[in-house]
């Protein structure tokens, strides 16, 4: 059995997220169909993370097990011939059996794009959040720096991450079983501290202006559900003056989702890279 590492880029606008879902178009489900068409195997690819509906990826990492002898270079070409243009396989390589796209990751980087111009082109609109209204960007820069380091990010998680993870894992196994898919997604008996709590380490959190775009870059050892978009939503409230820079520290300490701002739209978010 071969364990392959794929690097994917995709336009999340066309999909209901990464994870396979009944009667909805997903990135994972589309990849399942492409692999079955190519190899005749029913296998469930595992991503480094489950991007939500509308979230894009420049370099999502995927592991997939297969008995197919197709060389990796040929596999890339063949999959790209089958997949829709909104998904591209950028690279593929053989990995040892223990390598797993999610569990082996040590860091991820996301970027969030806000378009600040008065008029947003329709060709750009699906890849940014258009916000032409006044913002104090200097305060947003200050606020972003406060989340660097190790913190409990419960206030910025959509739901209890542990409960959600268990539910998603159960759903994944159920769907895989119903579809007769082979998967290497079984969790190890001993879960790491990172998987058991809401504490994450953020190595970089910064806003930068590039012409008419305000771009937030965040790199960390892991992210909770909606964490990046909830951070962005809160930083936007700081920029608008509804929250102060000091409020961000207070929100972190409260460990209460209701203390933070609304979730920013999915369109501006990109998974940029995954490190191993």
Residue ranges and their predicted role:
Residues 1-276:
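Structured-RNA-binding interfaces characteristic of tRNA pseudouridine synthases
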